[in-house]
């Protein structure tokens, strides 16, 4: 699939691991930062609707962590008619939170993208089935109907990774493009399984009273990189201190949220006006509880350091399934130069 097709398709669905959808606060919505840009001004792009999964950015902004790191932030949610990297490449944003797999696909078109920091340390994808399903492993997907939003973006790549991890071929399963109706389709028995994200789809289904089980796509068998801090190599090289400040303050906020989750809810509420009743607050807290472990990873501490081996495996996998349209060098598409713990990282840019 050509990148232009992917960009159009992801207008409402890109980086689904971040619970994205049509923007609720208007195209290119901003709510913080200075009105005129200076050397320390940084515009941080977030896709589409405000959500507690973006809380590290909200907290770093509202608590002054970005300012303390030496930058003046402007937080910008994409408009519903924007592509995932459109504003970044146009210079309207300096960094964007987006999935590493989609950045790699875009980079294969020759776009100047680089991941300067890890946002999710743990891959959030999972195969979701009814609790009563006979599917208990990825191998059990043989002969089953798997529902996904469409054959593009993170959910699609995760589906192909799940099939491979189960020792299967795509010909062994039926992949149905069902749009963003996974919950209804699974509940109605229209599909046997859906591929979604443990901190979004699975949470929403449980909140809706649907009895489900998850088969995780663990990092050892899933060669994909989820949400990352993405910029252009040109900007990072021209503004190395600002790039480090973004990664440092964002990861500092992750650790602060782990210590006091309420700070995330309070900061998100300034953006998400729906957090005004017990039901919406309960949902946000459930999503947050499922998201904090993704930020922290196995070490229970966020530091922004990325794993070059995982990026290399991902590039090889994406190439094997035919979604890369040119060469992608893992050492170019990701860099640990800007992570606060870079001196301890085993992979270098």
Give, region by region, the residue ranges found by the protein language model.
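Extracytoplasmic/periplasmic substrate-binding proteins
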Residues: 202-219, 223-224
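Short, surface-exposed acidic
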Residues: 170-173, 274-286, 325-332
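Short, glycine-/small- and polar/acidic-enriched structural segments
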Residues: 28-178, 183-188, 192-196, 215-216
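Alpha-helix/helix-capping structural signal
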Residues: 101, 199-200, 234
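Secondary-structure end/capping motifs
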Residues: 238-321
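Short, low-complexity disordered leader/linker segments with a strong preference
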Residues: 1-41, 342-349
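A bilobed periplasmic-binding-protein/Venus flytrap-type ligand-binding module shared by bacterial periplasmic
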Residues: 125-135, 225-242
């Amino acid at each position: 699939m050509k990148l232009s097709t992917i960009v159009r398709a992801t207008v409402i669905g890109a980086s689904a691991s971040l619970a994205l959808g049509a923007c609720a606060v208007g195209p290119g919505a901003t709510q913080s930062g200075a009105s005129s840009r200076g050397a320390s001004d940084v515009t941080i792009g977030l896709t589409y609707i405000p959500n507690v999964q973006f809380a590290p950015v909200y907290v770093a902004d509202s608590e002054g962590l970005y300012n303390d790191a030496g930058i003046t932030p402007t937080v910008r949610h994409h408009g519903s008619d924007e592509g995932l990297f459109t504003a970044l490449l146009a210079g309207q944003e300096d960094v964007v939170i987006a999935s590493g797999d989609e950045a790699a696909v875009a980079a294969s078109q020759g776009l100047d993208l680089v991941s300067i920091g890890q946002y999710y340390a743990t891959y959030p994808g999972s195969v979701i089935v009814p609790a009563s399903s006979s599917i208990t492993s990825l191998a059990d997907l043989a002969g089953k109907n798997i529902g996904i939003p469409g054959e593009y973006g993170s959910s699609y790549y995760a589906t192909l990774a799940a099939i491979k991890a189960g020792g299967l071929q795509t010909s062994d399963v039926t992949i149905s493009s069902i749009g963003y109706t996974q919950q209804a389709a699974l509940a109605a028995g229209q599909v046997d399984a859906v591929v979604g994200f443990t901190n979004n789809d699975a949470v929403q289904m449980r909140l809706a009273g649907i009895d489900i089980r998850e088969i995780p796509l663990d990092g050892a068998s899933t060669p994909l990189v989820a949400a990352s801090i993405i910029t252009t190599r040109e900007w990072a090289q021209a503004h190395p201190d600002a790039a480090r400040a973004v990664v440092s303050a964002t990861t500092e906020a992750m650790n602060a949220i782990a210590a006091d989750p309420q700070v995330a809810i309070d900061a998100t509420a300034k953006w998400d006006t729906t957090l005004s009743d017990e039901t919406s607050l309960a949902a946000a807290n459930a999503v947050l509880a499922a998201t904090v472990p993704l930020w922290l990873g196995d070490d229970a501490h966020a530091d922004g350091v990325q794993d070059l081996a995982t990026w290399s495996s991902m590039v090889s996998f994406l190439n094997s399934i035919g979604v890369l349209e040119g060469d992608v060098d893992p050492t170019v598409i990701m860099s640990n130069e800007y992570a606060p713990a870079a001196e301890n990282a085993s992979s270098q840019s």
